Amino acid sequence: MRLWISVCLCLAGVAGWFGAATSWLPGPPSVTEAISQDAPAPGATPAKVTANNPDNGVTISGHSQENRFVSVPRFFRSGDIPKFAQAVVNGTPLLTQCDVKNRWPDGSLKFAVISFIVPKVASHGTEVRFQNQASGNNEGYLDKSAMLDAAYDFDGTISLAGTASHVISARSMLQAGHFRYWLRGPVVTAVIIEDRDGRSEEVNTDGGTGNPLHPIFEAWFYPASHKVEIGFTVENSWASSTPAKGARNQDFELTLSTGKAAPAVRLKQAKFTQLIFTRWRRAFWIGSDPPPIRMNWNPRYLLQTGAYPNWDIDGLPNASALAAENATNTRLNPARFTIPGYDDIYASKGKGLGGIGKYDQALNAGGQADWIGPANTWDIMYLLTGDPAMEQMMVTNADLGGRFPMWYREADHKAGSGHYFDHPNFGSIDTYGRVVSINARQQVTLNLGNWRPGCAGEERDAINLTGPARVSGWGASQDTSHAPDFAYIPYTLTGKYYYLEQLQMDAAWSVGAYVGCFSPNPEPESYYRQGSMGVIPNISRQAAWAIRTMAYAAFVSPDGEPEGPYFADKVRNNVAMLEGEHGVALSIKDNAERNAAYNYGKVEQYTQSSNPSPLGAWRADDCSGPTPWSQVGCYATPANNMTPSAFGAEATFMEGFILVTLGLVNQLGIADATPLLQFTAKRYFHVLSDPAVNHYSIEQYVYPTRTAAGWVKDWDTYQKLYGRLPGGWRGFESREDTDNAYSLIAMTAVSYMSRLSVDGYSGQQVWQWFYTNRPHLRACSTYSPKFCIKPLATR
């Protein structure tokens, strides 16, 4: 059965927002040329389907229609498309606009938004493949006057009614020249309408000093049909050392309208408070919506690009899994699907838990959650199946997730003690308008619950507010221990700029939220971020999800912009610190800071550098803070199936989380985490392959790490520290059992060790045995595919 995927561009009333520009200046004026389906330009390479170059295309379906515009965000394998992608339908090359955002190190196409006109969309599906062409066809885009042509009826207004009231017009901002290009060419012109430099379009609704509300519109113009999709955003995200230049809570009623000749009200929101450091997005088509189309993303190829975890296509979610995922939405309070969400973190009002979309206010609550993992469950399901309900869920949650107060935009030039975005004191890139950089604000802590932790000299890096931060239940989860990845899949499956910035802001918060103090001579058991170093010596899950999101942002931030290198730098520092912590050789030696991070790993609070675990235990105890070896750790309890002789135990899920993240870091090419995976592979390979070890124990909640005498040193002692050894595999009986299942987390971790060998055990054979003998595919299909991940053969 074919799997169809909706293109987000065609969602009625929910799609919108485009992308971050690689240039702050509008491109030169250009008159739109007629679109024709000509032969390929010289240099085009015919698409071929071979064993080494599998079908790289998509399949578009929906209502039968002709000359349908389509924009497809797409990753390609390294080397598959040397220059630019061209769409081919039934052997006929189409005029194709290819807006390149990223290239592989060999120069071949990595990620682009590919736009073209499909001659005919068949209800049963029209296959589109991609081949190489010499040009991206990025001329012939709309200039300002063309976008203002009456045929587009272009306008979008944001009406804010408060103590002070305002109407902000996208058309007026465009006329004033406050825009920059995101996509350019004859098929689609996408612009970001914003005055980031001058802040001339900003307002307040409290009548106070300074204007914290920052409007952004994003418009995608399709000349062939004169259709425009417009996204609306209001940010309250400015971060400044001068309170009047920064964010402060604002109360207002909201109305969004589209069109110029006869404006249509698309959204009305009763009075609410837009909190500090929040943002939101809503998007609509001007006039009537185009007929919907659906697309098969071809996950078999897409996953081979290495851009995503290699989810198992033999365990794709079935109708039951999709229905169950969607059913969770219908049980939620409808107020959670509004811009302000529903504020009741403890469900004291009798209308269910507070939250925004599917995200609970209490993100850090214990137990399984759809947002814990390499990606949100619903995002994964959309990528793998294209189910329209999952698409709607992805867009809605990505649009509304900005309700949590964690989205910061730098308001100061040469901010903080470090002054520069790219390097403290000796950089070259100004901080203004970008995400908050800890290279500049070296000791800032982006945690409203720990706003001034007391670092020596932190005031030089401070973000100052007009008063106490009042964010009610939305500020309850200000660390990354249960943090979602809000925007990586939404950005890469829509190409929308809002989601790109959401990803970058999320990544910046992920490293900035940890205690920012710097100590020039760190003492044993230190736990600071070490200022601009950006390391996170804390419980494994807190580090795991911060590194995950930073790695995604490093991988997909547009080439030529500083955000990608910035996040890659922080990921590499964390890998170096963890190598120092575990006493393995430093693998990243590109600058002196890696040595500093490595040496810090030798003294931070979880270090085992001078006395590493003989059996490859990731941590002696993964508790909040170090546990003296003379004391029993937090996980070594009879309730967790440990005997009284066990003084320490590691949580298998926490260890699995960090190992899965390190595997992703390897796969994405951000850093070489192989030495760390090699260190921990010893336990996994022995438990799963050594005939003297109980294989089923791999899925226990915790495993023993130490006794009163020190580390567990042999497998006989290891097994005797369990209260009872399991006699078989656990069953998967629900979504909750499967979504964060310990055995599937372990299987995913082992998938990233498949090329290793330890004590004569082959990683590929260990993984194959685990995959074959531990029943799981039915659960992946029926419940959740989140941790159903296989080794990636090649990229």
Question: Can you describe what each PLM-predicted range is?
Answer:
Residues M1-S23:
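Sec-dependent N-terminal signal peptides
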Residues H166-S172:
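Glycine- and charge-enriched low-complexity intrinsically disordered segments
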Residues R68, M147, A151-I158, A170, ...:
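Generic structural signal of hydrophobic/aromatic residues within well-ordered alpha-helices
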Residues V31, I35-S165, H178-Y181, P186-D197, ...:
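Alpha-mannosidase-like glycoside hydrolase catalytic domains involved in N-glycan trimming
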